[in-house]
Amino acid sequence: MLKTTQTSLFIFIGVFLLIFGTDQAIKYAILEGFRYESSIIDIVLVFNKGVAFSLLSFLEGSLKYLQILLILGLFIFLMRQIELFKAHTIEFGMVFGAGVSNILDRFVHGGVVDYVYYHYGFDFAIFNFADVMIDVGVGVLLIRQFFFKQKQNKIKA
């Protein structure tokens, strides 16, 4: 079934709000003091001033504006590539909802609220639900775009 642009926008907004709301609710619990410690994973509060693995933290306050430009640029690009947007509406809703949630943290808290610390066997960077949703959204998009598209092309041939 082919999705109309209006249906795609509705789905995008729904996924966006679900991811954004879930992430902000979890972060609220963390900010209110929820903690957990175990031999595998800890839930602790950290304010990340950079991006993944604290990269670009030297940009400090200007990083949030750079990220806004990046998100707006990507959204404008997607509106011009409407078939790509319609094909990956859910994935883009996940990425945008998570990305905007992390940007909001920068404005409200001075850094992204991170809290998941995996340390079984090795130390891993502290991350949050939004980070996972960005990874899952991009991963599913890449798998669907490259692997399933190649399969479709073979069927058509």
Swiss-Prot record:
GO terms for biological process: proteolysis. It is a multi-pass membrane protein. It is found in: Cell inner membrane. The active site is at residues 114, 131. Pfam families: Peptidase_A8. It is an enzyme of class 3 (hydrolase). It comes from the Bacteria. One of its GO terms (cellular component) is plasma membrane. It catalyses: Release of signal peptides from bacterial membrane prolipoproteins. Hydrolyzes -Xaa-Yaa-Zaa-|-(S,diacylglyceryl)Cys-, in which Xaa is hydrophobic (preferably Leu), and Yaa (Ala or Ser) and Zaa (Gly or Ala) have small, neutral side chains. The chain crosses the membrane at residues 10-30, 36-56, 58-78, 84-104, 123-143. Pathway: Protein modification; lipoprotein biosynthesis (signal peptide cleavage). Its EC number is 3.4.23.36. One of its GO terms (molecular function) is aspartic-type endopeptidase activity. Keywords: Aspartyl protease, Cell inner membrane, Cell membrane, Hydrolase, Membrane, Protease, Transmembrane, Transmembrane helix. PANTHER family: LIPOPROTEIN SIGNAL PEPTIDASE (PTHR33695:SF1). Belongs to the peptidase A8 family. HAMAP family: LspA (MF_00161). This protein specifically catalyzes the removal of signal peptides from prolipoproteins. This is Lipoprotein signal peptidase. It comes from Helicobacter acinonychis (strain Sheeba). The lineage of its organism: Bacteria, Pseudomonadati, Campylobacterota, Epsilonproteobacteria, Campylobacterales. The gene is lspA.
